């Protein structure tokens, strides 16, 4: 399941970074843009109430590390997109997230997202460093690893 939060959500910190992300990601319809995403692995027996959705979430926040942790999402603050996948695809995406847990934040890629010269998550590997991501990059890469998205989809 894909999870998104809008820039005007009460769960976000009031910071220059979130304001900048919101201004760069503005929507043509005037609604607050989505500025954060997470990939939620919901087991069939997952607990989905009328107010929350829970499972294992994979993402990263600014200056943080890729996480894969149990999380509960409020339906009031988050927007969800369900998707179907096979057990093999689910396992492949889960393994991808486990393999990248602890990777750092892609600061240069985040601030140069508009540039054709921005570093990709794996650009750092040739320097002997682990991959670096921002939230949409790790979510898209996980979906690509499970063949939910194909390689024609941009990485962010």
Language-model segment annotations:
Residues 3-87, 122-127:
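Glycine-rich catalytic cores of cysteine/serine-nucleophile enzymes that process amide/ester linkages
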Residues 84-119:
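A structural motif
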Residues 6, 41, 100, 142-145:
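Short alpha-helical scaffold segments that flank and stabilize functional sites
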Residues 48, 103-108, 145-153:
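Substrate-binding/catalytic groove segments of enzymes
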Residues 68-81, 89-96, 146, 150-152, ...:
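Short alpha-helical interface patches
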Residues 117-156:
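Activation targets extended, charge/polar-rich intrinsically disordered C-terminal tails
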